[in-house]
């Protein structure tokens, strides 16, 4: 594959949605600059993308630290122009209200909302001088509904959605596409399968969301013509109740 002429930064490049997004954009010719809390866990992603002929580098990143996020996205832009930035940090916790400590509430907010603000702002700093780019935020069911035991997580995801809305209204006229993707169902991960019974053979097909299928939507969003941009969409399996 030829040397990429654009970079996608994936903040929260974990083993499922983040990794799948990285692989999809690498297959499309982008250099992937991947960040996650423990950079040692990125080796498998590097190897898989390289084996497919793509380009991927990255490092450890604390997305709650302003200077770290700014440096990370500047580094991404120095590899090749930063064209896409994906914020994919979760922070999902489920605690009864009276068991939710100040520390937990603050940490979840820092991870799922404040880090998204930092990411969006610093990505915009790199994109606005060129007058183009895409900034995508991964949301959840909790972005729209505060469930029982999800006071910390839902408040942070509500906040992230508001940050994304505000950014979209400000940056859209400057040719930067901001979108918020509501992942409104269980993603096919080992943790989710364990909660639903453990044995994959016992689960009906296509009732959990395949990260590869989700990643395809990020790819399609980036290639939307700007006369018909999507700000928000929700994704769920065909049989999901909603």
Locations of the language-model features?
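Conserved glycine-rich Rossmann-like NAD(P)H-binding loop of the short-chain dehydrogenase/reductase
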Residues: 29-44
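Catalytic loop of short-chain dehydrogenase/reductase
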Residues: 134-159, 164-165, 169-172, 187
């Amino acid at each position: 594959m030829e040397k990429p002429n654009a970079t996608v930064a994936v903040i929260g490049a974990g083993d499922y949605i983040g990794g799948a997004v990285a692989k999809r954009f690498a297959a499309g010719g982008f250099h992937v600059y991947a960040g996650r809390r423990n950079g040692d866990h990125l080796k498998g992603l590097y190897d898989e993308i390289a084996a497919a002929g793509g380009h991927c580098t990255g490092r450890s990143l604390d997305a709650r630290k302003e200077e770290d996020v700014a440096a990370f996205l500047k580094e991404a832009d120095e590899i090749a122009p930063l064209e896409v930035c994906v914020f994919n940090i979760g922070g999902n916790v489920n605690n009864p209200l009276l068991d939710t400590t100040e520390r937990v509430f603050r940490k979840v907010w820092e991870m799922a909302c404040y880090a998204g603000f930092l990411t969006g702002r610093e990505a915009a700093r790199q994109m606005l001088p060129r007058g183009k780019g895409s900034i995508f935020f991964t949301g959840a069911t909790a972005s729209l509904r505060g469930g029982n035991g999800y006071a910390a997580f839902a408040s942070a995801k509500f906040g992230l959605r508001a940050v994304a809305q505000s950014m979209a209204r400000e940056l859209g006229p400057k040719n930067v596409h901001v979108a918020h993707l509501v992942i409104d169902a269980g993603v096919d991960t080992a943790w989710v399968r364990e909660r639903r019974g453990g044995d994959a053979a016992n689960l009906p097909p296509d009732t959990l969301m395949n990260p590869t299928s989700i990643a395809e939507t990020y790819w399609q969003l980036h290639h939307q013509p700007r006369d018909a941009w999507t700000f928000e969409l929700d994704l769920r399996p065909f049989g999901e109740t909603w």
